[in-house]
């Protein structure tokens, strides 16, 4: 199927945004500069995205790998599968270069942070919370466990390694899960 001029412009803008954000950060990548690099008008950019935050959310969505749904019925196995997927996904050099810039921008821009959480992190968080809730329902995790704290304990080490090192040690997902699971009687 042939691409339309509009879809070609969309792709060019996304690629230009990825390049400029990687070089300058989100604050330094103006919509004018993105349009110039993409070879389109600024109006074309705004026809596809209402603002730079919306464009940046699409940039992240373009580079991330959405996790599959894990539903084996065994919460520990599902968590290991999901955490392993997250540890191994998005190892591209482009994502490694962009991630600290995106997180820094999100820290200073609550509206962007909320859009990122809803569009990019939300599905991951929802799946972890669902699996933890299944563990509580099955009695393999305590009813008193705070699910949000569990989410942070499981996801934090992987995200930290991804941000600071660009890669996650191969055994980290299993180690984090074993320590988390071992905490509960």
Which residue stretches match the model-derived regions?
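Short hydrophobic/aromatic patch on the recognition helix
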Residues: 38-49
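Amphipathic alpha-helical packing segments from all-alpha helical-bundle domains
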Residues: 77, 92-93, 97, 111-137
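Short amphipathic alpha-helical segment with a characteristic S/N-K-E followed by hydrophobic residues
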Residues: 13, 28, 51-56, 66-67, ...
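Hydrophobic alpha-helical connector segments
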Residues: 67-99, 150
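Basic, helix-initiating cap at the start of DNA-binding domains
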Residues: 1-24, 28-37, 54
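C-terminal peripheral helix-coil segments that are non-catalytic and often amphipathic
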Residues: 81, 87-88, 126, 130-137, ...
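Tryptophan-centric aromatic hotspots in well-structured domains and transmembrane helices
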Residues: 48-49, 116, 120, 155, ...
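All-alpha amphipathic helical-bundle segments outside canonical DNA-binding/catalytic cores
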Residues: 115-120, 137-152, 170-171
């Amino acid at each position: 199927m042939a691409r339309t001029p509009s879809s070609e412009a969309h792709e060019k803008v996304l690629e230009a945004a990825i390049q400029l954000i990687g070089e300058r950060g989100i604050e330094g990548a103006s919509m004018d500069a993105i349009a110039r690099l993409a070879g389109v008008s600024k109006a074309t950019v705004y026809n596809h995205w209402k603002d730079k935050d919306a464009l940046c959310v699409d940039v992240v969505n373009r580079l991330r790998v959405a996790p599959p749904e894990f539903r084996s019925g065994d919460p520990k196995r599902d968590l290991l599968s999901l955490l392993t997927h997250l540890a191994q996904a998005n190892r591209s050099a482009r994502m490694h270069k962009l991630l600290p810039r995106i997180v820094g921008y999100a820290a200073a821009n609550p509206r962007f942070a909320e859009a990122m959480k809803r569009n990019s992190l939300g599905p991951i968080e929802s799946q972890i919370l669902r699996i933890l809730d299944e563990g509580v329902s099955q009695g393999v995790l305590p009813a008193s466990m705070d699910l949000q704290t569990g989410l942070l304990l499981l996801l934090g080490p992987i995200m930290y390694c991804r941000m600071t090192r660009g890669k996650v040690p191969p055994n980290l997902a299993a180690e984090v899960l074993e320590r988390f699971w071992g905490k509960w009687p």
